[in-house]
């Protein structure tokens, strides 16, 4: 039986689908601009980024499609919008580099994971190139081969 992998203590959520759908060329760390109720909901583990992606407007980067489910005990004077567009905090050079690459054919900018760094929420984003169907099959085949190889090696030791 396979053991269920535990996520690191500071990790909030991960986009496992991104590594299957894309070749990750380069990764960046970006801060997230959040409201108070969002931070409280994230601490409760109510964030998902599986369908999220990054868009660029007016030389700024935004996380679009990330879902933060509001808590029932959240503030009554603020109406929570669970899928609002959130600003990513990056350096100007990083934004220019990402925008230049995304404008090329086939490149995309996707969130890979969100985690706590001290008391701040950070988002690891990746500059990604889309995989074709045969690339996905090759990746699965290589992963299965490595697993079988490890099993065989383990049996030889016993």
UniProtKB/Swiss-Prot annotation:
Source organism superkingdom: Bacteria
Gene Ontology biological process terms in this record: trans-translation
UniProt GO MF annotations: RNA binding
The keyword Translocase is assigned to this record: no
Localization per Swiss-Prot or TrEMBL: Cytoplasm
Keywords of the record: Cytoplasm, RNA-binding
GO cellular component terms listed in the entry, alphabetical order: cytosol
Keyword Cytoplasm: yes
Family label: Belongs to the SmpB family.
Record-given protein name: SsrA-binding protein
Organism of this sequence: Psychrobacter cryohalolentis (strain ATCC BAA-1226 / DSM 17306 / VKM B-2378 / K5)
Source species taxonomy: Bacteria, Pseudomonadati, Pseudomonadota, Gammaproteobacteria, Moraxellales
Gene label: smpB
